């Protein structure tokens, strides 16, 4: 490499190190290669997978009712210990020390989830091809470029000594299990016989990957979309149409966590935990502070940059790990949580509820575990992230907690001007000065599958180096183009808060032993990236809500202006849009940049209204007026201290709105209990239908009156329309399956009951409405956009936009008449035509080709059962028999010829089970994301008295054929729970197996 380019040895230069063969003990001083991974469907590799099912619960694995009295002698243990499995598969680890408890947590993780965690570390590290073959080399290149493993190395170095010791113990436990047991069946299918030893860095990578999935975002799509609007409409009209009509920041429902809980607005710099602010928040005076409309005219992106953005976006579209991250709002990757104070409950104790939403993979993302070391004050039970130690969601003897994702904006994407010199060195340009790009060489290997040779890795030819921009928090160049004649060019770089030495996992180490609000808040100071909303309850009767994360202060926003474009567009990398570097860092700082102080992040303790709700909605209400940049931070003396910017688009708000509505309904009727909380978690009422369906009744009522246009009258008289209108008029907006083979919350413990007539009627209405929703978006929004060559918004934005347009009779703030194509003498009549034509189109579609596999061309609306459309699948890494439906008994498809299990739910419901808002074919309503865990906790009055219940979409084990592979799934599907048994006596009364351990002599 030529002078001028900084060349450093890279963690991406993986040299294949020592491995642990099945049954081989690890040796000290092994050179360990650590990898990452990524979930892929590899059913084509598994023609004989069905033969693996019977023997998959291999020797050395637990089995229900199996007792093991002989203690296993393990090097590394400090004292005697035991693992008790209860009848639900939960491992309860009782150990001499916290270190031993974490060692055995590693042991049970390997026992239950070895292949899963191997895939996870390989995903994030960009070495998945070494496991699953050359088909994912492109994904490895992209993940290696983003540098999660490099970032994890920084975090590992910054962790405290107790944290690193815990990671080491956990890794030793994983490797100890591998040394004594055969590898799971997936490895045989991939011709792998050796496992690369787990390291503390691997757990740090898993933690970094989770933070990435919950916080990373590229600004490419919104930039490309707005550029098109500008080109077609011109700057002023584009701004009005884009921000005001189509891609709105304001939510569908205005539920906002802290203002709703406290009855007062959140004022950054004035409000404090548990103390409502004194008045309405100050809105930013744009004229007085130089933030005028010209600043919002869109990014200044040249043709080369436009091409780079499209090229990179196309590259990552097939990378499910990245695509899931970028589309997490569309895919309902979020969570629900709320807490109710004892003043509103039956027993006078607080209630805490939480259900995090992620992809519904098999095995589940979370691993149930109970960790006990009385000597070291550890007694925590709940869910761990497979691949990392400690409990991340759950309870200890004093406090209980849950989490949801905030949606804070902690990523900026930049257009860089670059210069390549004749000697081959490469530079970016900042304020007219050249700054060197760091080049990291990278080599990629892949598993050669099908050649009959085990553990055969080959080197991929022609692999590109990685280009790093130090100014961007060591973020990468995603793509670039250089003119060979001049050496001048353009690049796209990205800056993410998580690239720094952040310490999220440290938070969970501290939460596992927190005793009160003070301990809890102290632990949250380490949650630097992957910003979360934390819900809290304790045995002292407190409830609380806190947001976390280091939201960077941008230099222009801090100066009360916007330089060029807002942070959610591609910004100039040549100066004026930088994150402000910290001169001095505090012990808990992670990113190295100035950030919104913790005290200015939305939070409340024991709020005035006695409850608090978050479901990824706007926590502070800063976007309710559709402008995320018109509130200021209040500094010393009440003076403005920069723009208060958290993010530009939170969840569209239907879940938070419905939870708030349901709580209000129940509290209005009296006091509530844990059963009420579980019922709200199971709620499948469509809040958007409650708002939008009345337009159908109104339109039909108008259409049958005298004097309307012939076209509108004809629609009202078309076959089946009046029947459909009647069904929707009597509907309660719930979404049961309407099928005896479907799973509904009204069923019990996985046992499916015959639906009532009321459930059948609601099921039919849900089908008709859900297809109408797609058609009214198509007719009322997409027709106009498509006709002008303008990009469509995504599902959540589309539902927000169609509500906005229906409320305005189709006339946008841009003055565009979105319903102008429809016949009618007035805007209101054209609105009615769009609404009824969409219902006519929905009925025609249901009786046509698009839904024939479900409804066989039937025009009988009684046949339109929702369960035939709304189906869930649980996908395993290798697909085929490992998935559900698959080889697991008891979970066959609900209907012949239709994949998946019929379940209640739908778009934007509390019991997250969303599909695309434009779903227009029988298979479009199938989904694979939702609650990865449900939890309700009721803190008592003394230590150890928290009653917790949970649900898991599968089981503790990831080993196909194991009795705990899917034992909890039936209860999950019918919204039933299993108890978290924290007291030893309760565990012993519900014991399935036990294993003792002792230190090696």
Task: Set out the residue ranges of the language-model regions.
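Hydrophobic alpha-helical segments
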Residues: 411, 478, 490, 529-666, ...
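Terminal end segments
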Residues: 624-707, 823-1001
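Charged, long alpha-helical assembly modules
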Residues: 745-842
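Second-shell loop/turn segments in exported
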Residues: 101-105, 142, 151-164, 495, ...
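Glycine- and hydrophobic-rich flexible loops that cap the catalytic core of alpha/beta enzyme folds
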Residues: 373-383, 390, 394-399, 403-574
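Substrate-recognition/specificity elements adjacent to catalytic centers across diverse enzyme folds
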Residues: 60-351, 356, 362, 382, ...
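Bacterial N-terminal signal peptides
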Residues: 46-54
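Short, Lys/Arg-enriched N-terminal segments with co-localized hydrophobic residues
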Residues: 26-39
